[in-house]
């Protein structure tokens, strides 16, 4: 297994060069991964919120935000500051402990999942070797927070929203996991680094989307349902449930739901990029680029190009999927709850299971194409 660059070891070696002991260097390192993840996630949310506002405005033939900074780029910051200073209200008959714990359980697992996302060649905070398994385990915690929030609010609309969120998540978690298992089966690894490296042979032709088109579609549909994006926003349908499980929330507790939703959307887009679109891989193999430039593959220029373009490609692929998700919000009608559950249990689940069995058969029959 390619472990990639050990960021902790490199950081400790740099601090040792300044005369610090390994124990002190380790203590300084401990909060840094989460700090890096938090900063990356918050910046990603700010960009996504601005994109959603501008794309939504364009879809409705409006201008969108334009006064808060150039082209309204400061509007997401203004939204965050507004929520920060709003009063934090707990309903009179609500369970205050569960009411407060719910938003935390929604946000924390999503942020922790970012630890296993490689943003570029050898650029990964924690390559635990079972990154995909860890992400599936963490994603199963979020519905508990949603159900807890709906139950603790002492509001019928909130409770219905929480129940819908739990039912929706359970229905789509299984086909989501089965579609990922097909990719894991071809790679023989649960590491996100190994999954991307397995797609790096022939540029765009090596990407898993060609070998797993059905899995790609199932994963994207399930990811949208897990993120509660239209047409799957049943838990917070404004016309039916006011705001669903968020109805009684205000201030920073509401902001945690808001933040968690967008962080989950970006995370899902990044995982689609890693699992099916080659991650940091450039559509043209680096060997061809080096040959055109008449440079050896290990030349410093090629190494710098590979590292730089890797981060750019990962982010570009992810935001292309975010763009598609935003467009779907304004171009598709909301499904009913019975239609949503039927889609998950009667269609996606058997298709994803059949796709996994087909992948196993093709792996035995054509090991050179499906990971022998």
Curated annotation (Swiss-Prot):
The keyword Translocase applies. Keywords: Membrane, NAD, NADP, Plastoquinone, Quinone, Thylakoid, Translocase, Transmembrane, Transmembrane helix. Signal peptide: none annotated. This is NAD(P)H-quinone oxidoreductase subunit 1. It comes from Prochlorococcus marinus (strain MIT 9515). It is found in: Cellular thylakoid membrane. The keyword Cell membrane does not apply. It holds the Pfam family NADHdh. GO terms for molecular function: NADH dehydrogenase activity; oxidoreductase activity, acting on NAD(P)H, quinone or similar compound as acceptor; quinone binding. One of its GO terms (biological process) is photosynthesis, light reaction. NDH-1 is composed of at least 11 different subunits. It is a multi-pass membrane protein. It is an enzyme of class 7 (translocase). Belongs to the complex I subunit 1 family. The chain crosses the membrane at residues 27-47, 97-117, 128-148, 176-196, 204-224, 266-286, 308-328, 347-367. Its EC number is 7.1.1.-. It catalyses: a plastoquinone + NADH + (n+1) H(+)(in) = a plastoquinol + NAD(+) + n H(+)(out); a plastoquinone + NADPH + (n+1) H(+)(in) = a plastoquinol + NADP(+) + n H(+)(out). InterPro entries: NADH_UbQ_OxRdtase_su1/FPO, NADH_UbQ_OxRdtase_su1_CS. NDH-1 shuttles electrons from an unknown electron donor, via FMN and iron-sulfur (Fe-S) centers, to quinones in the respiratory and/or the photosynthetic chain. The immediate electron acceptor for the enzyme in this species is believed to be plastoquinone. Couples the redox reaction to proton translocation, and thus conserves the redox energy in a proton gradient. One of its GO terms (cellular component) is plasma membrane-derived thylakoid membrane. Its main location: membrane. Coiled coil: none annotated.
């Amino acid at each position: 297994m390619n472990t990639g660059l050990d960021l902790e070891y490199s950081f400790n070696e740099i601090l040792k060069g300044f005369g610090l002991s390994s124990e002190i260097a380790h203590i300084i390192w401990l909060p840094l991964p989460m700090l890096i993840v938090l900063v990356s996630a918050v910046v990603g949310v700010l960009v996504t919120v601005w994109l959603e506002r501008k794309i939504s405005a364009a879809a409705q033939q409006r201008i969108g935000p334009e006064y808060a900074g150039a082209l309204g780029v400061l509007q997401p910051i203004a939204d965050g500051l507004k929520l920060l200073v709003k009063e934090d209200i707990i309903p009179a008959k609500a369970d205050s402990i569960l009411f407060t714990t719910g938003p935390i359980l929604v946000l924390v697992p999503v942020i922790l999942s970012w630890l296993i996302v490689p943003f570029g060649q050898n650029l990964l905070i924690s390559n635990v070797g079972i990154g995909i398994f860890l992400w599936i385990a963490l994603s199963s915690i979020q519905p508990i927070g949603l159900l807890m929030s709906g139950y603790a609010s002492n509001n019928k609309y909130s409770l219905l929203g929480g129940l819908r969120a739990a039912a929706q998540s359970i229905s789509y978690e299984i086909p989501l996991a089965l579609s990922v298992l097909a990719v894991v089966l071809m790679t023989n690894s649960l590491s996100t680094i190994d999954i991307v490296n397995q797609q790096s042979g022939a540029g765009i032709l090596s990407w898993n989307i060609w070998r797993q088109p059905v899995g790609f579609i199932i994963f994207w549909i399930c990811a949208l349902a897990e993120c509660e994006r239209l047409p799957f926003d049943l838990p917070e349908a404004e016309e039916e449930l006011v705001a669903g499980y968020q109805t009684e929330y205000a201030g920073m507790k509401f902001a945690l739901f808001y933040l968690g939703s967008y962080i989950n959307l970006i995370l899902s887009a990044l995982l689609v990029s890693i699992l099916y679109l080659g991650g940091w891989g450039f559509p043209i193999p680096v060997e061809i680029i080096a040959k055109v430039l008449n440079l050896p593959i290990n030349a410093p220029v090629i190494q710098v190009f590979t590292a730089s373009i890797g981060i750019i490609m990962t982010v570009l692929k992810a935001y292309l999927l975010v763009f598609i998700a935003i467009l779907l919000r304004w171009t598709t009608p909301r499904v009913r709850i019975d239609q949503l559950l039927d889609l998950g249990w009667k269609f996606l689940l058997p298709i994803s299971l059949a796709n996994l069995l087909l992948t196993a058969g093709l792996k035995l029959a054509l090991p050179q194409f499906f990971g022998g």
